[in-house]
């Protein structure tokens, strides 16, 4: 007689669908904890006499035959050292991120295999409340009525869990200059029929100015504290008499400091030498910010198969930025009794009064969400609703009002060199911008099995939704008020289907493996854009239980976001910018806001995937993906102003009579076509440190990674109740298994992306931008050919160490090739964060000496531990002033110390 436990785990993929479980399984928003006798393990005696154990999926698993990209059990989760599900999602970013190339949005999040109103419902839950995490490829999103453009994360909760935790964090950079403090308190209760979570966060960060990073100010401006004189005479001469005293033609001279009536002789001492125009102490690299956020979720079972959940969130964020000093130029007449020059000159200077130019912003965000789940026979009906309101008010200080001061200088009644010159200045009326963005969304999905084929169940999902978007904005600038009011109603419908063609245990499937196809079609009717179509089809082949191939094609039509059309127009002065045409760095005005002339986008993608979990390597999974993206009329933020971009968008750029850059209109634009191809491959591997956990050890310690759903059963025979054991960090102790010890684990996720093609055609008739060979659309240069993502670490006897980072290869941005223009080269960068944490519960001597430390954790986080910042050089090897490392990454290496206590 032979027992095949490995086969038992693999057979979990054919278990009863999670949506059709009996009443007691899905009676709450949380998963009922399962003891050994709750996991059915029917023993069958086949004709060969072999005992076959048929293991079922863990309750709350996703009902799909598509194998997960990654699975994390309780030991894996504990080894990450996360404080919330937000931290946990960040820790598994390499596995959860999609390589489809359609942005870096959050993955789709499920709770116990079901839709929720949004990630807000779960993000503040403590990781100790999670029994298992499953990460699925993009095609599983179709099952839940989503587009297949993001991966899916399913969180399976424990039952009868309760905790109250507080956490304090303090962070500051190695180079000093600013600090961040954050306090968070979280209350969580998960019972037999209810789930409640309340989280309060308060965060404050001080400002960081340019002077605190020793940045060199860009030249070219005569403005300075104290002032500089420039000539208006022949050849720019200030005064023939001054030139005689200085012994050369004088066209510029710094105003002698601390002298109210400087003489020509004193000006001769500053001839052709300017006062320093650095005002870095009045310009911020990072604003002062404050944030208060409250997030709460309540869920209750209304019946055996009916669950209602409600979520509410409020966030208040304020920021203050410094934009420089008031400054202008005056004509000082030669007839002025305070001028020693005898002819007209120009005085250019900054003023410390009234105060630095500022931008103040305050944002109020209120969001609510609800989810209703109900089982209708064999069909799962889910209704989600969301309302979000974001109100923003921005106040930007304009320059001072120099009218009276200028008139007094011209009349000769005001001494422009006096110490109190400009002491009574007042600001002009500030620029004001306010916007209210509201979004109402209701969506209904119905998923189930309409029929069963010999190869398996046909699964279908029907989805319908309604969205109303409202944007009201008002701007007031230079006495002119501009109002924008946009409304958009979206009605959408879609249907998704997955059909098994062959089953491994039926007919020809035993020879050729499992084959299945899926398809989806949907349309959206936008009140301001008309109808938009989306479609997709996919093929899945599993020649072996541990090897899967997938191919899919997706297409959709997309409208610009309502904010991209109607955001208020803002003008930000004194923005550090590099001008490729002249090869210089300077401060200019930048216009941002919405562009009502944008048009819709059409996209089509081809995706090929392969997943392999070899039998001969435990807890190892290898993945390979190929992506090809084609887009027409893409909406993009305004790209980096290279000569190619300036030629295509000449009307967006303003230069003065000398060709110096004055301003850029950076409101969104449409590109005619974008094409990209990339290969992404990677591996997930994990294991235990030391001997395997014996029977009766911590729950879930032997879960498989990357295998089929249900491969990680809840606890070993004779062991504790999986996920049970009362309150605390799971099990019978605070930080893990009975006695307070968690299994020792290590894990590595490593992914490499190789970009084959990244091209943009701005409009027909202009050259194609090749982002891999010298073209650029962002201030970070072109597209990196290579990108590597790493997430890994170990956890042993209460101590944890994690490394998480990204490597990107260098890029270039070509200039015009004409004299004065420069190419820029951007270096490789390896941004690595390190985490070291200790669970004090597992340090018996420490807890005995200080009982308060029971249930606590101390974490040291080092952001950018290598202090690696992109090094930008022109073709002569010089660093452009606008690309000084303080501008690129003003934070640098940051140390953060946190203390978390669970009560």
Residue ranges of predicted features:
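N-terminal plug
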Residues: 36-44, 51-101, 116-125, 140-147, ...
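A beta-strand signature from Gram-negative outer-membrane beta-barrel systems
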Residues: 116, 125-169, 209, 718-719, ...
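Short strand-turn segments of transmembrane beta-barrel domains in outer membranes
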Residues: 134, 152, 161-188, 277-287
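Short loop/turn motifs that connect adjacent beta-strands in outer-membrane beta-barrel proteins
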Residues: 160-163, 190-193, 302-307, 374-380, ...
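C-terminal beta-signal and adjacent terminal beta-strands/loops
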Residues: 630-632, 705-708, 712, 716-734, ...
């Amino acid at each position: 007689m032979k027992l095949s436990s490995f086969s038992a785990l693999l057979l979990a993929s054919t278990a009863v669908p999670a949506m059709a479980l009996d009443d007691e399984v899905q009676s709450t928003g949380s998963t009922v904890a399962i003891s050994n006798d709750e996991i059915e393990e029917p023993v069958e005696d086949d004709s060969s006499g072999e005992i076959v154990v048929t293991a079922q999926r863990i309750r709350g698993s996703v009902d799909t035959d598509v194998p997960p990209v990654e699975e994390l059990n309780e030991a894996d989760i504990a080894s990450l050292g996360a404080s919330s599900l937000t931290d946990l999602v960040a820790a598994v970013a390499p596995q959860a991120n999609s390589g489809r190339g359609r942005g870096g949005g959050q993955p789709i999040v499920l709770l116990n295999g079901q839709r929720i109103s949004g990630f807000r419902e779960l993000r503040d839950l403590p990781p100790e409340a999670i029994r298992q995490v499953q990460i699925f490829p993009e095609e599983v999103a179709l099952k839940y009525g989503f587009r297949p453009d993001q991966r899916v994360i399913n969180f399976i909760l424990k039952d009868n869990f309760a905790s109250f935790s507080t956490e304090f964090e303090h962070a500051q950079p190695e180079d000093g200059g600013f600090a961040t403090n954050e306090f968070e308190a979280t209350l969580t209760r998960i019972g037999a029929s209810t789930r409640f979570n309340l989280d309060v966060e308060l965060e404050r960060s001080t400002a960081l100015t340019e002077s605190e990073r020793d940045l060199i100010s860009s030249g070219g401006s005569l403005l300075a504290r104290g002032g500089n004189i420039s000539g208006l005479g022949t050849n720019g001469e200030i005064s023939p008499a001054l030139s005689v005293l200085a012994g050369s033609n004088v066209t510029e001279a710094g105003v002698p400091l601390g002298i109210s009536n400087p003489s020509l002789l004193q000006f001769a001492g500053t001839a052709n030498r300017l006062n320093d125009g650095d005002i870095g102490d009045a310009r911020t690299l990072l604003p002062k910010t404050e944030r208060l956020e409250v997030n709460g979720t309540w869920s209750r079972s209304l019946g055996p198969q009916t669950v209602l959940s409600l979520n509410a969130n409020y966030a208040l964020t304020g920021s203050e930025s410094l934009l420089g000093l008031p400054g202008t130029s005056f004509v000082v007449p030669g007839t002025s009794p305070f001028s020693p020059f005898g002819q007209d000159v120009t005085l250019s200077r900054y003023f410390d009064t009234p105060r630095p130019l500022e931008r103040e912003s305050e944002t109020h965000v209120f969001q609510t969400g609800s989810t209703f789940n109900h089982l209708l026979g064999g069909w799962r009906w889910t209704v989600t609703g969301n309302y979000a309101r974001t109100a923003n008010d921005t106040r930007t200080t304009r320059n001072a009002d120099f009218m009276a001061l200028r008139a007094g200088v011209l009349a000769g009644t005001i001494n422009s060199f006096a110490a109190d010159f400009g002491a009574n200045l007042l600001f002009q009326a500030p620029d004001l911008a306010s916007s209210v963005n509201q979004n109402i969304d209701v969506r209904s999905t119905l998923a189930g099995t309409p029929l069963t084929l010999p190869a398996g169940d046909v699964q279908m999902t029907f989805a319908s939704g309604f969205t109303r978007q409202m944007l009201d904005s008002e701007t007031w600038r230079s006495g002119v008020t501009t109002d924008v009011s946009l409304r958009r109603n979206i009605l959408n419908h879609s249907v998704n289907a997955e059909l098994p063609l062959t089953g491994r245990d039926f007919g020809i499937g035993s020879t050729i493996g499992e084959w299945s196809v899926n398809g989806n079609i949907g349309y959206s009717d936008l009140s301001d854009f008309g109808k938009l179509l989306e479609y997709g089809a996919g093929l899945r082949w599993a020649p072996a239980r541990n090897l899967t191939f997938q191919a899919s094609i997706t297409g959709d039509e997309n409208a610009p976001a309502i904010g991209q059309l109607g955001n208020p127009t803002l003008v930000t002065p004194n923005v550090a910018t590099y001008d490729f045409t002249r090869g210089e760095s300077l401060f200019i005005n930048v216009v941002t806001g919405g562009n009502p002339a944008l048009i819709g986008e059409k996209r089509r993608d081809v995706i090929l995937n392969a997943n392999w979990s070899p039998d001969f390597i435990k807890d190892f999974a290898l993945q390979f993906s190929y992506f090809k993206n084609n887009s027409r009329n893409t909406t993009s933020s305004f790209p980096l102003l290279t000569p190619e971009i300036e030629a295509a968008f000449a009307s967006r750029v303003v230069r003065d009579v000398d060709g110096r850059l004055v301003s850029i209109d950076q409101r969104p634009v449409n590109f005619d076509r974008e094409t990209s191809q990339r290969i992404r491959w990677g591996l997930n591997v994990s294991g235990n440190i030391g001997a395997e956990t014996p029977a009766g050890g911590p729950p879930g310690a032997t879960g498989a990674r990357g295998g089929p759903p249900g491969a990680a059963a809840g606890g070993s025979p004779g062991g504790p109740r999986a996920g049970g054991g009362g309150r605390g960090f799971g099990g019978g102790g605070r930080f893990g298994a009975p006695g307070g010890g968690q299994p020792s684990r290590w894990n590595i996720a490593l992914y490499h992306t190789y970009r084959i093609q990244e091209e943009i055609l701005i409009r027909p008739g202009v050259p194609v931008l090749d982002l891999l060979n010298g073209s650029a659309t962002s201030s970070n240069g072109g597209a990196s050919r290579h990108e590597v993502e790493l997430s890994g670490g170990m956890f042993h006897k209460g101590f944890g160490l994690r490394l998480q980072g990204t490597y990107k290869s260098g890029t270039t941005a070509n200039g015009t090739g004409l004299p004065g223009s420069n190419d820029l080269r951007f270096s490789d960068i390896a941004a690595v964060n390190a985490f070291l944490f200790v669970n004090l519960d597992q340090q018996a001597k420490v807890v005995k000496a200080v009982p308060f430390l029971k249930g606590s954790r101390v974490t040291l986080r080092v952001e950018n531990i290598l202090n690696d910042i992109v090094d930008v050089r022109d073709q002569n090897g010089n660093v452009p002033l606008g690309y000084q490392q303080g501008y690129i990454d003003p934070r640098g290496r940051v140390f953060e110390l946190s203390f978390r206590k669970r009560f």
